[in-house]
């Protein structure tokens, strides 16, 4: 702890080792370092050769001051915060036998120049093996989630036209904060854009719930701030997760 009372977290431990994304059968697109596990941890626990691609995982410049969220999480600098969160993400995903890929876009809280939807879609489409099932966020409420959701929608349109598999998940904790209203609105919007979403029946075995809970516990720097901001819902849905399979609406004809 520094003399001014700010906790400085150490990330000196080496990162767990990670396989390459080339052999992944399932790839989950995550806006931030924790969103994939918050929303899809049970699915990740159930699937072999799963990977999480986190979009806003770039490390800010050393001169970047901490955001209010960083301060609430106990960090004295922005790059220290992101390096610690990367380490936590690697530990969490390793516990689920999942791999990870961190893109270098900065979190919106650092007041960065945002990519366009097409730029981000191109990056995602190029990073993910064509044979993998791609699962992305609806893109609910928060700026980074909305940008990631819009880019994923563009990628899904492309991949479905190529005969590839895509699905979408409800972003937690935002999905439950309004009892699913924003998710229902977003699903209607996807339908208007030519994508039909079919809810998956989700098994909810105790072992997968326990695996997700253990993975969430790895995000030590995030748990306190999440709970203070959003209440118990922030710690992730341990009931059935909300996932929809996507197909082109014109396939109904």
Residue ranges and their predicted role:
Residues 1-19, 85-103, 108-115, 127-129, ...:
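The feature marks non-catalytic terminal segments
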